[in-house]
Design a protein with these regions (language model features):
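Outer-membrane beta-barrel domain signature
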Residues: 72-81
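Short S/T/G/P-rich N-terminal loop/turn motif that feeds into the first structured element of a domain
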Residues: 1-51, 58-70, 85-111
Length: 111
C-alpha cells in the first residue's frame, strides 16, 4: 500500500516563529487520533520563520478529517496572525523510504 504524505508549509509572521513552533508541536501529535502513521514538524535552519508540517496517512480522507477537525480549525483561528495565508498543502504518494536507526542517546535528547 502506498501511503500518502501531506506537506503543509507555514511561514511565520514577524517575531512569531517561536510561537508558531510551539503551536505546531502541540498540534502535530493530535494527527495520530485521526489515523496518522507519522508526523514531523520541520523548522528551517536558513530561515527561522519557515516551517513544514509533514503527516503520513493511509487515506486522504484521514487528512481531511484532521485538517477540518476541531483542533486544527481552532489552531488556525487562534494563531491566524502568526503565519502567512493561504495555507496550501500538497498530497504526495510515498514511493520510497529509507531510514537508519539513531543512537539511543541522541533520540532521548531530541524527544
Amino acid at each position: 500500500m502506498a501511503y500518502g504524505v501531506v506537506h503543509l508549509p507555514f511561514y511565520a509572521t514577524g517575531f512569531r516563529g517561536d510561537d508558531l513552533e510551539a503551536a505546531l508541536s502541540k498540534l502535530a501529535p493530535i494527527s495520530l487520533r485521526y489515523g496518522a502513521i507519522r508526523y514531523d514538524v520541520f523548522r528551517s535552519r536558513d530561515d527561522r520563520y519557515k516551517f513544514v508540517l509533514q503527516v503520513e496517512f493511509a487515506e486522504k480522507s484521514q487528512w481531511d478529517a484532521f485538517y477540518f477537525g476541531e483542533e486544527f480549525t481552532e489552531m488556525r483561528a487562534a494563531c491566524s496572525s502568526w503565519f502567512a495565508v493561504p495555507l496550501l498543502y500538497w498530497w504526495n504518494d510515498n514511493v520510497a523510504r529509507g531510514e537508519l536507526r539513531r543512537d539511543e542517546e541522541l533520540v532521548d535528547e531530541l524527544a
